[in-house]
Curated annotation (Swiss-Prot):
Similarity field: Belongs to the universal ribosomal protein uL30 family.
Subunit structure as annotated in this protein's UniProt entry: Part of the 50S ribosomal subunit.
GO biological process: maturation of LSU-rRNA from tricistronic rRNA transcript (SSU-rRNA, 5.8S rRNA, LSU-rRNA); translation
Gene Ontology annotations for the cellular component aspect, listed alphabetically: cytosolic large ribosomal subunit
Keywords: Ribonucleoprotein, Ribosomal protein
Membrane-crossing segments per the record: none
InterPro entries, per the entry: Ribo_uL30_ferredoxin-like_sf, Ribosomal_uL30, Ribosomal_uL30_arc, Ribosomal_uL30_CS, Ribosomal_uL30_euk_arc, Ribosomal_uL30_ferredoxin-like
Protein name: Large ribosomal subunit protein uL30
Keyword set includes Ubl conjugation: no
PANTHER family: 60S RIBOSOMAL PROTEIN L7, LARGE RIBOSOMAL SUBUNIT PROTEIN UL30
Listed GO MF terms: RNA binding; structural constituent of ribosome
Pfam families the record matches: Ribosomal_L30
Gene (name only): rpl30
Length: 155
């Protein structure tokens, strides 16, 4: 089962109530926040509802490992370290990221991990308008594998 990375790009100021509720259920409370979810029909429906406020795509194991290493946080705002992952799970961050992407483990199998990753705005800016879809040359919507390039620029 593939893992999807969802990044919120737009504010919810003028959004309908159900869109704001769905963004809250996805834990995307602020702009430039990222969450990792399973590619299931229920999440697909939620993504479809908020497609005008987020961008998403399939994350690969290298990008997930970098994301965990650089932006992953534990409760108390402590960074995720190799020592912590080794102590709790008996593996490195790269091995954990590979198992998460392959569906063998979930992110929450690592105790005390925060489910949201707070990112910087992308270096070089978003390639296009925040009001148009990625297919039309904008920034929103489905990106596929190109989400990894955007995450790299936001780390």
């Amino acid at each position: 089962m593939a893992k999807l990375a969802l990044i919120r790009l737009r504010s919810g100021i003028r959004a309908r109530g159900e869109v704001r509720d769905t963004l809250a259920m996805l834990r995307l409370h602020r702009i430039n926040h990222l969450v990792i979810v399973d590619d299931t029909p229920s999440y697909r429906g939620m993504i479809q509802k908020v497609k005008d406020y987020i961008t998403w795509g399939e994350i690969d194991k290298e990008t997930l490992a970098k994301l965990l290493r650089k932006r992953g946080r534990l409760i108390g705002n402590k960074p995720i370290t190799d020592e912590y992952v080794k102590e709790k799970l008996g593996m490195t961050i790269e091995e954990f990221a590979e198992k998460v992407v392959n569906g063998e483990m979930k992110l929450r199998d690592l105790p005390n991990i925060k489910p949201v990753f707070r990112l910087h705005p992308p270096r070089g800016g978003l390639k296009g308008s925040k009001k148009r879809s990625f297919k039309e040359g904008g920034a929103l919507g489905y990106r596929g594998e190109k989400i990894n390039e955007l995450i790299e620029r936001m780390l």
